[in-house]
Amino acid sequence: MKKGIHPENYREVLFYDASAQMGWVIRSCVATNKSMMWEDGKEYPFYPLDTSSASHPVYTGKRREANTEGRASKFNERFKGMASLAAKK
């Protein structure tokens, strides 16, 4: 590898997808102050992922159901009086 072309913080970082319980150790410059012990017994800077190829439905082929019950009940609560107004007309 050519010397002097990478930033000072270019190091091995553990990217971890908690929803899929999978992680990858990759060289990166990502800013993080967390660290985690990995399967190989070494401690790496740790960067949590919301989604990755291990958990995203496009890559896994599995469908995830979104929790819409809260939103639907909020909508119904907000507009419950509208049905009676429409029926009166």
From Swiss-Prot:
<dbReference type="GO" id="GO:0003735">
    <property type="term" value="F:structural constituent of ribosome"/>
</dbReference>
<dbReference type="GO" id="GO:0005840">
    <property type="term" value="C:ribosome"/>
</dbReference>
<keyword id="KW-0687">Ribonucleoprotein</keyword>
<comment type="similarity">
    <text>Belongs to the bacterial ribosomal protein bL31 family. Type B subfamily.</text>
</comment>
<dbReference type="InterPro" id="IPR027493">
    <property type="entry name" value="Ribosomal_bL31_B"/>
</dbReference>
<comment type="subunit">
    <text>Part of the 50S ribosomal subunit.</text>
</comment>
<dbReference type="GO" id="GO:0006412">
    <property type="term" value="P:translation"/>
</dbReference>
<dbReference type="InterPro" id="IPR034704">
    <property type="entry name" value="Ribosomal_bL28/bL31-like_sf"/>
</dbReference>
<dbReference type="InterPro" id="IPR002150">
    <property type="entry name" value="Ribosomal_bL31"/>
</dbReference>
<protein>
    <recommendedName>
        <fullName>Large ribosomal subunit protein bL31B</fullName>
    </recommendedName>
</protein>
<dbReference type="InterPro" id="IPR042105">
    <property type="entry name" value="Ribosomal_bL31_sf"/>
</dbReference>
<keyword id="KW-0689">Ribosomal protein</keyword>
<dbReference type="GO" id="GO:1990904">
    <property type="term" value="C:ribonucleoprotein complex"/>
</dbReference>
<dbReference type="Pfam" id="PF01197">
    <property type="entry name" value="Ribosomal_L31"/>
</dbReference>
